Design a protein with these regions (language model features):
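Two-component/phosphorelay signaling modules centered on CheY-like receiver
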Residues: 10-29, 96
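Active-site residues of response regulator receiver
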Residues: 52
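Alpha4 helix (beta4-alpha4-beta5 surface) of REC/receiver domains from two-component response regulators
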Residues: 62, 82-100, 106-110, 114
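Receiver (REC) domain active-site loop signature in two-component systems and cognate sites
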Residues: 55
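Acidic, metal-coordinating helix/loop segments flanking the phosphotransfer/catalytic sites
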Residues: 18, 30-48, 69
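Conserved two-component signaling phosphotransfer/partner-docking surface
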Residues: 12, 20, 104-110
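Acidic catalytic/metal-coordinating carboxylates
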Residues: 33, 59-63
Length: 124
């Protein structure tokens, strides 16, 4: 089963995202900030880090950089409601996917599926 670490500081958004991903068959561990995600990255395996960019204590870009050091095989996908932040993420964390808010939950699930479809296709 594909494991996803979700870092999102908004309680309602975190709940909705986790539920949508779990309903799609993914195992989700959800935390409310980047600093809370780091110990999970250090201690467990995740296939995907799904992170908001703008969060207290540690933003999603910094979290993605730490993830690249700790767990380089973990894919990274950002979610954000700020276009300028999205552009910064694309510059500072190349190769990551950025999904801009607002989005439908089905769009999130489709993007996650696409990440792993591409991964499996590349192995064949």
């Amino acid at each position: 089963m594909i494991r996803i670490l979700l870092a999102e500081d908004d309680d309602a958004m975190r709940t909705y995202l986790a539920r949508a991903l779990e309903n799609a068959g993914y195992e989700v561990v959800a935390v409310d900030r980047g600093t809370a995600a780091v110990p999970f990255l250090e201690e467990q395996h995740f296939d995907l880090l799904l992170s908001d960019i703008v969060m207290p204590e540690m933003d999603g870009i910094e979290l993605a950089q730490i993830c690249a050091d700790i767990a380089p095989r973990t894919k990274v996908m950002f979610i954000t409601g700020f276009a300028a932040v999205s552009m910064k993420a694309s510059r500072e964390a190349p190769g990551t996917k950025v999904l801009s808010k607002p989005f439908h939950l089905k769009d999130l699930v489709m993007e996650v599926e696409r990440i792993f479809d591409d991964q499996w296709t590349a192995r064949i």
